[in-house]
Amino acid sequence: MRQFTHGTLLAILALANTISAIPSFSANNYPAHPAEPLALFAQSQPQAPLGLWTRLRNSVIERLWGVPPQQRNHRGGNKQYPFYSAPASLQARYSDDVVLRFRLQTADEVKALVEASNILFLDVWASTDEWVDIRLAKDVVPSLLGLLPKSLQTAHVPLIHDLPQTVYESYPSSSQRPTDNGRGFLPSRESSSDVTNIFFEDYQPLSVIGPWMRLLASMFPSHVQLISIGSSFEGRDIPALRVGVRPANDPKPRKTVIIGGGSHAREWIGVSTVNYVAYSLITTYGKSTPISTLLEQFDFIFIPTINPDGYVHTWETDRLWRKNRQETSLPFCPGVDLDRTWGFEWNGNATGDNPCSESYGGDEPFAGTEARQLAGWVKEQTEQHNVKFIAYLDLHSYSQQVLYPYSYSCLPRPPNLENLEELAMGIAKAIRLTNRQSYTVSSACQGFTASQKKVKLDTFPRMESAGGSALDWFYNDVGVKYSYQLKLRDKGSYGFLLPRENIVPTGKEVFNAVMVLGKFLLGSDGFEGLNWEAEFQRLNEADKPILDDGDDDEEEDGQDKNDDSWIPDEYKNDNDHDDDDDGWGLRRRRKR
C-alpha cells in the first residue's frame, strides 16, 4: 500500500472537490463517439475487492474525469474496436479537403509551389528540402496543378485517405479506457521506471490540463510551483510549471530551461509531450541521483501551450486550426501565427497585409498577444528575479527534425554553431536509441551544418516566412545559448492527427532527449559519475503504436482508398509503382 498519510489523502480528496466542475468528456466539448454499451468493455474475469487506496484514488478519478476508471476503453496491442463514422459536422467541414505531398527536385519547383500556395491561400502543413505537404479543397486541386510546372503536376500523392474520419479519431473516446493494473490519474509516489498514467492514454483538453497541473503542484510542493506566464487574447491564463529546487539565499543567477509547446494550436503531440516530460521529472525527483542533481542545479519551466485560445478552438470548433484567435484587420480571418510574430528579424512583409495567411505574423513585431506575454515574462524574470535562461526547447510537429538557429536566414553563422550541432546530434541519437525513430539535424533555415566550410547559397526557397521565430528571438535577444525547435512525430502518415498511441512513445523520446540536454549542461564539473543512460526510458510492448504497414490492400467500408477522381486525368501519375518514390509507401498505406 502506498505510503500516504491520512492528511495527504484527505488533502487530495479536498482538492478534487475544488475542481469537480471540470467538464466531463461530452459532445459539448468535442466530437465524441456515440455512447457504447458498458457490457462491451466489461471484464471477463471477476475482480478482486478494491483496497482502501484504490477506492480513494478512484473517487478522485471520478471527480476529475466524470467516469469511473473501470469504464475506460483500453486501446492497445491487436485488440479490435468498434468503428464509428465521423459525425455530419466533421464531414461537412473536412470531407471536401485533401492533403497532398509534393516531391521536390529543383529550386524552380519550390518557387513555383510557393507562389501557387500564396495565390490560392493554401495551408502548408510541413516542408523539408525533399517534400511539401499541403492541405486544400479538392476542387482547388486543378487550379493548383495548373499553376505548377509539368514536373510537379504528377509528383504528388494523397497522404490521408479520409480526413474527416482521421480528424474524428484524433479526439478522445467518450467510452474511457480501463486503467492498467489499477493505475489511475494520480501521480505515483512509488519508484518506477515506467510512466503509466491514464492522463497520457489520450490527448487532453485545456479544461483537464489546468487542474492536472494544479494537482501536481499541490502534491509535490518541494520542487513544483504552478505559475502564470500571462493572459491570452481571449483572457485565458497561460499556465506553466516551474520544476526545480533552488537553494536558499543563493546569489548566483538561477540557470533555467524553458520547454514549451502548442504555439500552433493543432499540434497536440507537442502539448502532451511537454506534460509528459514535466510529469517524468517531477515524479522521479528524489528517486534518481541524476534527475535530483539536474533539478537542484537548474529550474525547468514547462509551458504546455502558449496558445490556449487556439488550443481550445481545436477542441471545440476546428481541429486543424493553427494560429491564435485574436482579431485582425479582416474579421473573417482571425489569428496570428505565434511563431512568426517575435521581434527578432520579424518579416511581416512576407505575408503582406494578408491576415488570411496561415503564417501571418501580424502587422508589427510582437503583434501576437501570447508571444508578447511570454517575452515580457522572460524579461521580468531576467531583470527582476535573478534568472538566467540557458536552454529553450520549442516542441512542434511534424517531420521529425531537430533544428537550431538561425531560422530567418542561412547567411549568419551562429557563434557557437559547433556546440549547437553537437548537442542536436546527441538529442537525435537519444531519440533514435529509444525507438529507432530517425530525426534529421540541421539549422532551421535548412541551409548548412558546422562541417561545411561555407553557406550554401543555392538552397531551396522557403515555403513560408521564417522570420520572427521564437527560436531566433531566444537565441539572439535573450542570449539562450542552446535554443532548439523539435518537430516531433510523424513524417506525414498522420501529420497533425497523430494517433493517441504515439503519446507515450513520443514523450519517452523527448524525455531521453532532455536527459542528454541535462548531461550536456552540467558538463564535467564534478558530475562525471552520474549514470544518465540508466535514466533513459525504454519502450515496452504496450507503448508501441500500431503502425500501418501497407500490406493490406483490401478496400474497406466499400471505399476505394486510391480514389483520385478529384484529380484531372491529365495530372494523374501513371507510374503506380516506383520503388524509388517516397510516395509509394504512403500510397500503399492502409486506410485507417
From Swiss-Prot:
Residues 202-521 form the Peptidase M14 domain. Glycans are attached at residue 349. One of its GO terms (molecular function) is zinc ion binding. Substrate binds at residues 264-267, 322, 339-340, 397-398. GO terms for biological process: cell wall organization; proteolysis. PROSITE patterns: CARBOXYPEPT_ZN_1, PEPTIDASE_M14. PANTHER family: INACTIVE METALLOCARBOXYPEPTIDASE ECM14, PROTEASE FAMILY M14 CARBOXYPEPTIDASE A,B. This is Inactive metallocarboxypeptidase ECM14.
